[in-house]
Amino acid sequence: MTLLSVAQMNSQDDIEANFIVIESLVQQSKADGAELIVFPENFVCFVGGKQRETAAQFESLQQRLEQLAHQYQIWIVAGTLPCPFRPDGSIMSDGRVRTVSLCISPEGTQARYDKIHLFDVQVGDVVGGYQESRFFEPGTDVIIAKTPFGNIGLMVCYDLRFPELALTLRSQGANILTAPSAFTYTTGQMHWQLLLQARAMDSQCQVLGAAQQGWHGEKRQTWGHAGAANSRGQLLAIIENEGTQLITVPFDLTEQIKIRESMPLMQHRRLLQF
């Protein structure tokens, strides 16, 4: 059995202040005996309109996170960072950036996932509408990170609404799905817990949903409720409190194998043509 931690934060626009919180959560996770900690979307800097400015620091921020993983000998799913270049090193010519989730081992970065599904929606909150595609270029590749405790399928926030991605990750060998997120208060209240459990049930993977919670400036409010669901789709734990919090949950690969053998969903799937 392995212990895995899921973080909840209220990140603001002060990178150094956020890093103090990040390190404290790593310390707490390590004290809990966890092998992995998952951070939420925008965990290093949460502010609209500064994507390019933060993206310019991508490599230095990555190095700082690698140093934390090495210092504390823990795996880190580094929420998301804005990045000015694609995985092949090419720069986006239109001024947009990529939303990148890194999986970092104590020895360094092991995988990079660029968020595929962008949040272009109308929400009945103070902000009203969101159009991530104005500022971000979507990724195209499905990514698995191999770890000593199982294969991690990397997802980000809005990706949770698309079961095809979770099922593709499962078909490529994922045991765990990570979903660093910053759900709006409105959409989170409606669907967050449901999505964690639904994607776990669909894929028979353990789902770890790290979350932003609270106010970020005067208009942006996030739902929080960082949580985890097991390979049956049952809720393992969810944070009900506000602000910075951490949960640590068990993951048993042997038990997951038994669940999948007893209900072999992937073998039973039939993609019908209508």
Predicted regions and their residues:
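Short, acidic/polar
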Residues: 17-27, 161-167
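Short beta-strand scaffold segments in enzyme catalytic cores
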Residues: 78-79, 99-103, 143-145, 226-228, ...
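CN hydrolase (nitrilase-like) catalytic-core segments centered on the catalytic cysteine
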Residues: 58-78, 151, 160-244
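Active-site catalytic loop in hydrolytic enzyme cores
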Residues: 90-172, 185-187, 194, 261-265
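A short C-terminal boundary segment appended to hydrolase-like catalytic domains
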Residues: 254-274
